[in-house]
Amino acid sequence: MRNFKDKKADIELIYKTANNLNLPIHIFLPEGDIHKAQAVLVIHGGGWNDAIKDNSPWNGGWMGNNARYLAENGFIGIAVSYRSLMVSEELNVGDILLDCADAIRYIKEHLKFIDFGDIIYMGDSAGGYLVTVLGLSQNDELRPKAVVSLNPVLGLLDSKWKYGFNNCADIGKLTPKNIIGEKCARFLFMHGTNDSTVEIEYTEELNDMLRKTGHKSELVKIPDAQHAFILYDYKYPDEYVTDIMDRIITYINAELK
């Protein structure tokens, strides 16, 4: 067993090139038969900017440790990244979503040992927004079995986030509460009650809307937690983050196997 703080991936791939940037996928494998392992795809946050800006080696980003920890607990951990909006003024969040969709299509085409009928998407902050939209997709090719969305950015027109939607023809089509349809992944939201970066009220609203429309959704409030409580080497000690990760793994094993 490897130390989960080691973000060196077992498989490193480029899923596409856009704006002259090579966009990466890092895969962390568990011990044993990988064909029997459930996959969790993690998408990091960092606003709309803290992503791929150049072609320097990628170290797995904010959630590489989380992907490795999942692998150490029997899952296939998959970390993907996307274009930073700092690359071009012409880019917006719609392009980031396109990157994530292309990563999913690449994995489905090239990594046949991953069971997409059983896959889970997990994202933090801006990544929480991205996995939420993918979980609401009416496209069966993109929608996962379940989503774990951690303090997701949902107030898209708030001053902190609306820059990501410049040049968007219709922001309504990128707003989660506006795109709830007949098909929907199962959702687990987790949000800190002391989050001053992304307000919990937006998550409460979306969770309530999903439940009222008959979809399976649960919101776990983390008492006194600040933003990005799931990240190692950020605000909280390893033990705190690992406890949250273990709660997520317990949920997956109990509810999503």
Model regions: which residues?
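Structural cue for short, hydrophobic secondary-structure segments
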Residues: 42-45, 79, 189
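Conserved alpha/beta-hydrolase "acid-adjacent" motif
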Residues: 196-202
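C-terminal catalytic histidine-bearing segment of alpha/beta-hydrolase fold enzymes
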Residues: 204, 213-257
